[in-house]
């Protein structure tokens, strides 16, 4: 019998009306703004009324360094949420929205997989409720107003060479990384060099995901630094009077999206910054709403714990005042073998020796999460090629690192395949969490970058030229020294070289560029060759996506 694809499983799901899902959380129908029958936004008025309620337990799902195909972190997040509900706990899932770039590129969608999916899967992986389009429009409105201001006399005296605000689109397109705009003569403005980033790297995306409410959203938008004058003094979004119009475009996008899992459990899907080039977490407003409505909230942070979890702890939890109760590190036998030196085409063959070598990567991530004072458990996301000897080797290694490991079959079995992990998470969440960020607010910006590099990546030093160091000092003098840092680097390694696997020690982290995200409230350090506008692979997933003769989508995964 052929194995069903994710899209076939999702289509066969028996979805409940979204009002019924909301009612299970105590959300009245009038507080929902429906987008069809199976998805809705939760109104701001209802969310404001939740203030004062006690919070549930916050559970983070993170992972080891992934293979290019991902290791099922979202699948495990969904499965764990279903598993908690299965054992009688009131649980909600909080995940990010999907970007079109990876969907048509290499990684695929962001709705989970197998029997642990959020539905409607096709909508979620495409336009969903239009949030990303609103973010793209708001971002590019500001870009248009910058060039328009210069065209009509440049009263703010913006230096065209020092405009830092680029344009965005939600697609992988390397051709747009560096562009020249305003060509074509006097009628089109003053030519200047700029470029595009992918929408998920936009500061507007980060602002939407970190803002408390609409008022905070507009205030943060106004704080965006768009560029500098000749005397190097900053020009803000509020100086261009753009923040109000941007907030109008984002008004509906600020409301969290409610959907359901295949097993009809509630899921908030809202926001979608990448963890390698941004802070990698779903929105604060969705997480806070879920914490007021459920006893357990299961959320994820992008890629491995060196990126997503570190930013979840040091940026999201710090800025939003959140305190996680437990963390799950997702590992797969195939990724551990890859970290142990096995080629991608050989990952289906048993190799316990390589697996044990690769387990050093798992150990590093366990230690890093423990370093934040959060209790840890390991989820072994099962693949059919795993052998019993390999699974036992992972269990034994994790136990030696002080973390229990559970084999999870949620992809194939749904919540029934992850009950043991759910029980353990409940147990861990009842133990005291000694959560604390990695560094204090008052540490200098460059020292914060060094702290992340040395303690999380185990680097020997951070390489940054005097221009970067001077820029950081200038920002500190301007009052931005207390901001956390957001390290943008490859997700495949603790180094900036994607080919170096395992748990390397003593390497250097080169910082190529720094960017001030004053509205979001952090400083970005772009490390190595990471790009904020990805490119498509030689054989993009888009080549396999099409409509069948009945108009149904095929090839989406």
UniProtKB/Swiss-Prot annotation:
Catalysis performed (reactions): (6S)-5,6,7,8-tetrahydrofolate + formate + ATP = (6R)-10-formyltetrahydrofolate + ADP + phosphate
Nucleotide-binding found in the keyword field: yes
UniProt binding sites for ATP: 67-74
EC supergroup of this enzyme: ligase
Keyword entries, A-Z: ATP-binding, Ligase, Nucleotide-binding, One-carbon metabolism
UniProt pathway: One-carbon metabolism; tetrahydrofolate interconversion
EC number of this enzyme: 6.3.4.3
GO BP: tetrahydrofolate interconversion
Entry annotated with the keyword ATP-binding: yes
Annotated disulfide bonds: none
Residues annotated as signal peptide: none
GO molecular function: ATP binding; formate-tetrahydrofolate ligase activity
Family listed: Belongs to the formate--tetrahydrofolate ligase family.
Matches recorded under HAMAP family: FTHFS
Name of this chain's protein: Formate--tetrahydrofolate ligase
Taxonomic lineage from the root: Bacteria, Pseudomonadati, Pseudomonadota, Alphaproteobacteria, Rhodobacterales
Gene, per the UniProt record: fhs
């Amino acid at each position: 019998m052929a194995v069903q694809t994710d899209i076939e499983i999702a289509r066969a799901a028996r979805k409940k009306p979204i009002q019924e899902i909301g009612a299970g959380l105590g959300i009245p129908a009038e507080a929902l703004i429906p987008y069809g029958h199976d998805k809705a936004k939760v109104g701001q008025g209802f969310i404001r009324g939740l203030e004062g309620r006690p919070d549930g337990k916050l559970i983070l799902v993170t992972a080891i360094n992934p293979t290019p195909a991902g290791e099922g972190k979202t699948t495990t997040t969904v499965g764990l949420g279903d598993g908690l509900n299965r054992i009688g706990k009131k649980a909600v899932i909080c995940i990010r929205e999907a970007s079109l770039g990876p969907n048509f590129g290499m990684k695929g969608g962001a709705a989970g997989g197998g029997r642990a999916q959020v539905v409607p899967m096709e909508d979620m992986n495409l336009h969903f409720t239009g949030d990303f389009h609103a973010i793209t429009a708001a971002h590019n409105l500001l870009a248009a107003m910058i060039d328009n201001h210069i065209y009509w006399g440049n009263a703010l005296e913006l230096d065209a060479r020092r405009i830092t605000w680029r344009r965005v689109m939600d697609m992988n397109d390397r051709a747009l990384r560096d562009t020249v705009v305003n060509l074509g003569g006097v009628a089109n403005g003053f030519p200047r060099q700029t470029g595009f980033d992918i929408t998920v790297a936009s500061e507007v995306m980060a602002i939407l995901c970190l803002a408390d409410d609409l008022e905070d959203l507009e205030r943060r938008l106004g704080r965006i630094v768009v560029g500098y004058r000749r005397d190097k003094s900053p020009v803000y979004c509020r100086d261009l009077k753009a923040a109000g119009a941007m907030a109008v475009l984002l008004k509906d996008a600020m409301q969290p999206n409610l959907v359901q899992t295949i097993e009809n459990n509630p899921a908030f899907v809202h926001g979608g910054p990448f963890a390698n080039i941004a802070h990698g977490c779903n929105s604060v407003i969705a997480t806070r709403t879920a914490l007021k409505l459920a006893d357990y909230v299961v959320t994820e942070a992008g890629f491995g714990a060196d990126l997503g979890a570190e930013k979840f702890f040091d940026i999201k939890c710090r800025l939003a005042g959140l305190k996680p109760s437990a963390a799950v590190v997702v590992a797969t036998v195939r990724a551990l073998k890859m970290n142990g030196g096995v080629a991608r085409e050989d990952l289906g063959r048993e190799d316990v020796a390589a697996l044990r070598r690769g387990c050093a990567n798992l150990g590093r991530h366990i230690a890093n999460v423990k370093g934040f004072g959060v209790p840890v458990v390991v989820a072994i996301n099962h693949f059919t090629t795993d052998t019993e000897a390999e699974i036992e080797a992972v269990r034994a290694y994790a136990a030696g690192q002080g973390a229990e490991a559970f084999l999870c079959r949620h992809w194939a079995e749904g919540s029934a395949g992850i009950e043991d992990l759910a029980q353990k998470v409940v147990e861990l969440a009842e133990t005291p969490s000694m959560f604390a960020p990695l560094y204090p607010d008052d540490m200098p910006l460059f020292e914060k970058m060094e702290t992340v590099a040395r303690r999380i990546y185990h680097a020997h030093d951070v390489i940054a030229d005097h221009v970067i160091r001077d820029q950081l000092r200038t920002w500190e003098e301007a009052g931005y020294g207390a901001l956390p840092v957001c390290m943008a680097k490859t997700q495949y390694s603790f180094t900036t070289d994607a080919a170096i696997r395992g748990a390397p020690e003593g390497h250097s982290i080169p910082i190529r560029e720094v960017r001030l995200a004053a509205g979001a409230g952090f400083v970005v350090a772009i490390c190595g060759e990471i790009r904020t506008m990805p490119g498509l692979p030689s054989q993009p997933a888009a080549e396999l996506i099409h409509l069948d003769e009945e108009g149904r989508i095929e090839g989406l995964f």
